[in-house]
């Protein structure tokens, strides 16, 4: 295979380790080979004194990384190989933890879609640079899963109930909104990205601070009062009731999302964010893996991926079908 066809391109020069996610037709979704290759590169560069920073990008111009390859994960389940899916997730979560533990700058240039696993390989690093074309989200409730890759550690520490809103609805943040929320650290206009990349590849980490533009309070800050009022209500039924009481277009849109995603995933996500507030990142990643063992075999994951990404009929048949039918006993069992 030509190296330029490899799913991960890893090079080093000028004291910089450069990683490029290279599955543009799959929006750079992470598969097992990519996770293993990233982990190998990180293992090599972590203790190499010649490497002063690591730069991560996505190839193709459309996406940084659209997430883990959940279609592949669903196929593993359908073929009766759920153990392979858990093995993949275990290695992915270990990579997330290794990025967080790195004592060197880990710089992600996010100029396009960044969701799920893409958040996982960026948010735990030191520098997350977004452009106005960046689109960030944790939309796992849409596919019957939960916000994993250690994102519960980040979501649970956002101001007020911002993490509950983003984790439950999968709301999308554009550009500087991701800095406001805490997923990103710096905003740089796309037109300034080539010069910034060149400076970073020359080992100039200070170029980020010189290039980044200030992010004043904007749309995310403006939503804080209603987000806190509704998504801080304390339980999924209480959140629904609070949104119904708002009688605004925004509240109705959020209600529609909550009625559309997996009811079971909503309850799992709400509980995991509650627990995450008392955990460190390794604890959150351990919770992710334990939950993955109980949630991925549950019907909603395979069904959610089928409806959104395989058959694309956007008509998932959830188990159970509504928020009102979710059993607290079922949710508690998933947490062991």
Map each language-model feature to its residues.
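Glycine-rich beta-to-alpha active-site loop
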Residues: 99-143, 165-166, 170, 175
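Conserved CoA-thioester-binding segment of acyl-CoA-metabolizing enzymes
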Residues: 1-57, 97, 333
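Contiguous mid-protein beta-loop-alpha structural module that forms a pocket-lining wall or clamp
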Residues: 148-205
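Amphipathic alpha-helical blocks and their helix-capping loop/short-beta junctions
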Residues: 183-261
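Hydrophobic/aromatic residues within transmembrane alpha-helices
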Residues: 56, 69, 121-122, 177-178, ...
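Glycine- (often His-adjacent) and acidic-residue-rich active-site loop
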Residues: 58-94, 144
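Long, low-complexity C-terminal extensions of enzymes
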Residues: 243-249, 258, 262-336
């Amino acid at each position: 295979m030509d190296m330029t066809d490899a799913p991960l391109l890893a090079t080093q020069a000028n004291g910089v380790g450069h990683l490029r996610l290279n599955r543009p037709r799959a929006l750079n979704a992470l598969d097992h080979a990519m996770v293993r290759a990233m982990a190998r590169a990180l293992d090599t560069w972590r203790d190499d004194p010649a490497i002063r920073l690591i730069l991560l990008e996505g190839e193709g111009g459309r996406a940084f990384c659209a997430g883990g390859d959940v279609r592949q994960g669903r196929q593993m389940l359908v073929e009766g190989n759920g153990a392979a899916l858990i093995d993949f997730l275990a290695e992915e979560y270990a990579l997330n933890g290794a990025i967080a533990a790195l004592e060197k700058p880990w710089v992600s240039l996010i100029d396009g879609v960044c969701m799920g696993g893409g958040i996982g390989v960026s948010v735990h690093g030191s520098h997350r640079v977004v452009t106005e074309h960046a689109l960030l989200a944790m939309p796992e409730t849409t596919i019957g899963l939960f916000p994993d890759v250690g994102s519960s550690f980040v979501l649970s520490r956002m101001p007020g109930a911002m993490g509950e809103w983003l984790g439950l609805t999968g709301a999308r943040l554009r550009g500087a909104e991701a800095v406001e929320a805490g997923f990103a650290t710096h905003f740089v206009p796309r037109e300034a990205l080539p010069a910034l990349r060149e400076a970073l590849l020359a080992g100039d980490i200070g170029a980020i601070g010189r290039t980044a533009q200030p992010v004043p309070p904007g749309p995310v800050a403006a939503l804080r009062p209603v987000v806190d009022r509704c998504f801080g209500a304390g339980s999924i039924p209480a959140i629904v009731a609070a949104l119904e009481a708002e009688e605004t277009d925004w509240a109705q849109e959020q209600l529609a999302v909550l009625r559309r995603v997996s009811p079971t995933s909503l309850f799992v996500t709400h509980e995991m964010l509650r627990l995450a507030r008392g955990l460190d990142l390794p604890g959150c990643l351990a919770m992710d893996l334990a939950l993955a063992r109980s949630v991925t075999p549950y019907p909603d994951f395979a069904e959610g991926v089928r409806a959104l990404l395989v058959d694309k009929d956007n008509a998932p048949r959830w188990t159970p079908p509504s928020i009102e039918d979710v059993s607290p006993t079922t949710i508690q069992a998933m947490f062991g």
